[in-house]
């Protein structure tokens, strides 16, 4: 039997990132998934990450503010040392993900306040980062094993949208009709892909995160 240094159970974002990072460090890794689809609940999520003090954060953001917020909302359930470590080094995560081909951004800034806005250290926006869409065709046949988004996260239960698009369409804010037409044209105009599947070639939200991580593994 081949020697394995690390066994990772589950192919969600946490599992895939753990496997990739262990491989980066020179360890032999095996990732196990019980389902016939990969991605877990991460694939069905919004795919966003909470990164305090990132390049697009509110000007008053800081590691100290983030730690104060985390200590308040976790109510002692997480050791302070772990919270402090997260507040300090999580800002490195977007760059690491970008090196894997998974790109995050804040758009538009200051529109996603922290869940507990009255808590000490809360930010009015900028800490929640969205994942950029990706072309599902680069996954080859593995595209069809990627766990699908929930129907309510898609237009007509099948057309992918990202978080800024969803906000714009829901609020019918400036330019929403043009955005809707562009999304429809991208989906219905892709005749070659439509002959293969009803699923959108454009991956967004958690599907984009998981698809990008799978591509990074060479899978």
Show the residue positions of the predicted features:
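A short, basic/flexible loop-to-alpha-helix module at the beginning of a structural domain
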Residues: 1-3
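N-terminal Rossmann-like FAD-binding beta1-loop-alpha1 element of flavoenzymes
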Residues: 5-31
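Conserved N-terminal/central alpha/beta ligand/cofactor-binding core
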Residues: 34-219
């Amino acid at each position: 039997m081949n020697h394995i240094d690390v066994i990772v159970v589950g192919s969600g974002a946490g599992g895939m990132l753990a496997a990739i990072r262990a491989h980066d460090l020179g360890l032999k890794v095996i990732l196990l998934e019980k389902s016939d689809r990969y991605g877990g609940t991460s694939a069905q999520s919004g795919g966003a990450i909470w990164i305090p003090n990132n390049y697009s954060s509110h000007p008053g953001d800081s590691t100290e503010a983030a730690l104060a917020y985390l200590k308040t909302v976790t109510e002692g359930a997480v050791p302070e040392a772990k919270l402090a470590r997260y507040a300090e080094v999580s800002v490195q995560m977007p760059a690491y993900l970008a090196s894997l081909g998974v790109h995050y951004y804040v758009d538009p800034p200051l529109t996603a306040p922290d869940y507990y806005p009255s808590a000490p250290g809360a930010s009015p926006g900028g800490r929640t980062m969205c994942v950029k869409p990706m072309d599902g065709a680069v996954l080859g046949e593995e595209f069809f094993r990627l766990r699908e988004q929930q129907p309510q996260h898609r237009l007509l239960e099948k057309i992918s949208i990202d978080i800024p698009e969803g906000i714009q369409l829901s609020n019918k804010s400036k330019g929403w009709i043009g955005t809707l037409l562009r999304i429809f044209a991208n989906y219905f105009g892709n005749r070659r892909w439509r002959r293969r599947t009803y699923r959108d070639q454009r991956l967004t939200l958690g599907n984009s995160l998981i698809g990008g991580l799978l591509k990074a593994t060479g899978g």
